Amino acid sequence: MRITLAAHCSCRVGGVEQYLATLVPSLLAAGHDVSCWFETAAGEHEPILAADAPVEAIVASEHRDPFGAARAWRPDVIFAHGLSDAAHERALLDVAPGVIFAHDYHGTCISGTKTIRAPRARCCERTFGPSCLVQYYPRHCGGWSPVTMVQLYGLQRARLGLLASYERIAVASRHMAEEYARHGFASKVRVVGLPIESPVAPAARDDGDGAWRLLYLGRLEFAKGADLALESAVRTAALMMRPVHLQISGAGSLDATLRARADHLTRVEPRLSVTFTGWLDQRKAAAAVDHSDLLLVPSRWPEPFGMVGVEAALRGVPSVAFAVGGIREWLIDDVTGRLVDADPPCVDAYAAAIAACLIDRRWLARVRQHCRESATRFQISSHLAALEPVLAESAYARLARTVA
């Protein structure tokens, strides 16, 4: 097949771009022709495409006629990934039949988090529509700007409308399949999983100074629960009466608040130490996982998948996570980590789950082995076996309708 991958950025600025960096060489190796269509470039980041990759790349922001160039390449199918401009989506769907990979809540939530904050934080299962505008402020679904709210609503409404024009909707989890089924797309949605592989072999474990080592790896935002990771760590130190070190790796709007709070908590509880590293590249993130006893995934929002937990599991590190979204499809409670009830997401319950993991060394050893075994399900070969039929049936669906 001739496959055009369409995405927002040509550089590795997030999980979507990292996925594409893994997918492109695999599609080429499988005998497909691949081109890429990007809305923009971010030159300070590592590019998705290797310098010697036999792939035509079109960057819309730098091209006089990006859609004409896409059409001239004559793709069999467009495989879209989170374009920021709905007009770009619409134009590309005129070029060839389309498959969209819904990496997030594309077209089904104003804020994109599917999380309400009032009267208490919990995941939202509403079907997107005008009533979301009524609920937005009372439920604290997002920010306080009415202009931004209306703009985001318009964007998501346009995206939802465009989903009907795609031949198929690919998702990483059954949770996301259910989300799009609720919005009327049950016949189009296909679960294809994600390819997750380790960049380097796991390093030998080093118990170091005897402190328990916890790792939070992600955006420092309310929806991701970065604050819950910090508050749970100090409670764990108090519960265990033993040194606990928490490494927080990431960036976001809570950065300054978390640093100030950590400074206070480490003075109150001297058995707690906290290190902030900012974002880590793939290899440094892998090294951080190797030096951790547990990965903390305290997300309040229903993670579409939560690939960070599988990345850690491949390296033999279990996760403690709230039972939300797609997390429940890779984290098996008491087998590859601990699931904590998320209604509501409670610091005390989360800290108790962390302590329960750490107090039993035999349990930890058993779970580490199960993590490695379970995570091997998410190989690129398995992903391609699920994805290729979806792309093929989409490529020929429009042709079949035309002939009929």
Predicted regions and their residues:
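A conserved mid-protein helix/loop that constitutes part of the nucleotide-sugar donor-binding site
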Residues: 18, 22, 212, 219-235, ...
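Carbohydrate-associated surface elements
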Residues: 175, 195
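A short, well-ordered alpha-helix in the C-terminal region of glycosyltransferases
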Residues: 363-377
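N-terminal strand-loop element at the rim of the active site
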Residues: 6-13, 18-66, 252-253
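Membrane-proximal helix-turn-helix segments that form the acceptor-binding/catalytic region
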Residues: 106, 122-168
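Acidic donor-binding loop of glycosyltransferase active sites
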Residues: 290-304, 317
